[in-house]
Amino acid sequence: MKRTKSIRHASFRKNWSARHLTPVALAVATVFMLAGCEKSDETVSLYQNADDCSAANPGKSAECTTAYNNALKEAERTAPKYATREDCVAEFGEGQCQQAPAQAGMAPENQAQAQQSSGSFWMPLMAGYMMGRLMGGGAGFAQQPLFSSKNPASPAYGKYTDATGKNYGAAQPGRTMTVPKTAMAPKPATTTTVTRGGFGESVAKQSTMQRGATGTSSRSMGG
């Protein structure tokens, strides 16, 4: 009997320790996770063009112009491409599309589209761009083109979105916001044309995922 009691006491001590130490371990892990999240975020500014950037950053006109021009090049490389002007206008609105030269790897969905495009594709105009410090504390700046639709029927209507369809809120330049550093990473080059409404679907899906992630984070922090 004494041996049995001894075993039970030892088992009780182990279980008690596990139950009471686990919350502490979780708390420590949470602190490290939060610290990691903080380090992975970056403060960026949203501008419509180089003039807006220069006005907000006196003495940085050259940097603003360079970032703007780089964003334009990135937009040409990564923006959604459409085989026809009509498809692009249906997504982004009248006066919001421009012809873009065919890029290596671009492939219309069928021969009719290839003939209609005559070697060129259509893409939305760059509505603005995000600008932030380069990773590693360099003296330069990172930039990311932003697009916006003026078609009320589009999920991208009145919003700033990147080439992947991720939503960054109202299309109002001059704002500053915090984004993950991954938001400033180069996006994949566009290699195929998008069907009419396809980009809007991507925006809608991304918005749903963002809302879900925000809700999960709020519930976790609230316990």
Swiss-Prot record:
Composition-biased stretches (Polar residues): 204-223
Feature: compositional bias, Low complexity: 178-195
InterPro entries the UniProt entry points to: Biofilm_formation_YgiB
Taxonomic superkingdom: Bacteria
NCBIfam families hit by this protein: PRK11653.1
Similarity annotation: Belongs to the UPF0441 family.
Protein name: UPF0441 protein YgiB
Organism: Escherichia coli O6:K15:H31 (strain 536 / UPEC)
Record-linked Pfam families: DUF1190
Disordered: region residues: 178-223
